[in-house]
Amino acid sequence: MKTLVSYDIVEDKVRRKVFEACKDYGLTNVQYSLFFGDMTHNRREELFQRLRRIIGRQEGKVLICPVCDKDLRLSKAIEVSAGMPEEAAEAAVSYPGRSRKKARAG
């Protein structure tokens, strides 16, 4: 099942270890503190236990969220880059698992 992992970790060293653990489990870094990928229930549980050991008593938060295919098809994203032409920015709405569609006004 697709899985989102989001974290907000105060300590740089701990945050880096969380980042590396997510990469070790085959997840893709899609935003600064957000990973996405395909994981079985058992692999999600293994990652959870590993992250719990990494964080220990340090200040921070981790969210591991399984996402079903139906909900993934309903997801939407907006991506605009600096210097992007206005026409491209208007078309920057994407739907994971589907081709990009132009945003509609109104």
Swiss-Prot record:
Task: Identify the stretch(es) annotated as Disordered.
Answer: 86-106
Q: Which UniProt keywords apply?
A: Antiviral defense, Endonuclease, Hydrolase, Magnesium, Metal-binding, Nuclease
The family database entries (Pfam families) matched by this protein are listed as: CRISPR_Cas2 (PF09827)
Q: Which organism is it from?
A: Desulforudis audaxviator (strain MP104C)
- UniProt family annotation: Belongs to the CRISPR-associated endoribonuclease Cas2 protein family.
What name has this protein been given in UniProt? CRISPR-associated endoribonuclease Cas2
- EC number of the protein: 3.1.-.-
Xref: Gene3D superfamilies: 3.30.70.240
What gene, per UniProt, encodes this protein?
cas2
The task this protein performs is described as:
CRISPR (clustered regularly interspaced short palindromic repeat), is an adaptive immune system that provides protection against mobile genetic elements (viruses, transposable elements and conjugative plasmids). CRISPR clusters contain sequences complementary to antecedent mobile elements and target invading nucleic acids. CRISPR clusters are transcribed and processed into CRISPR RNA (crRNA). Functions as a ssRNA-specific endoribonuclease. Involved in the integration of spacer DNA into the CRISPR cassette.
Q: Which residues bind Mg(2+)?
A: 8
